[in-house]
């Protein structure tokens, strides 16, 4: 009996959720979904490339471009982690969850591939340059 009583005490403190609580939860969910949609849909891979191209003056300063992409991916992982957390807590509808994650996965894969190709191209050109100058 005492275990049962202890269990009951640990249950959700609000026995009857008030209308205000429901209202707050709905507002929080709608606001979060709107923000997530805005954040995700404004960053297509092409927009990221354009943004980084402007920041890094692509051909002349490849290390700046790589830095900008790394910075973007860092922010991107924060958004991704937040999304997963909010989904686990039930703040995302299934529709938003199903729309958001494939898009985020695609951005992540394409951005990483682009970053890898950029670094490999730079390393390859440095090796060629070094070989030519030695011989």
For each of these PLM feature ranges, what is it?
Residues 1-135:
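Amphipathic alpha-helical assembly/interaction segments
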């Amino acid at each position: 009996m005492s275990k049962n009583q202890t269990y009951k005490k640990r249950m959700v403190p609000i026995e009857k959720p008030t209308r205000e609580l429901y209202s707050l939860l709905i507002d929080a969910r709608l606001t979060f979904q709107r923000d997530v949609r805005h954040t995700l849909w404004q960053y297509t891979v092409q927009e990221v490339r354009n943004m980084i191209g402007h920041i890094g003056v692509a051909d002349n300063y490849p290390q700046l471009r790589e830095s900008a992409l790394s910075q973007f991916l860092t922010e991107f992982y924060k958004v991704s982690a937040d999304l997963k957390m909010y989904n686990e807590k039930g703040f995302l509808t299934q529709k938003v969850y199903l729309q958001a994650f494939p898009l985020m996965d695609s951005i992540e894969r394409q951005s990483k591939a682009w970053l890898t190709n950029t670094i490999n191209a730079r390393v390859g050109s440095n090796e060629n340059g070094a070989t030519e100058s030695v011989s």
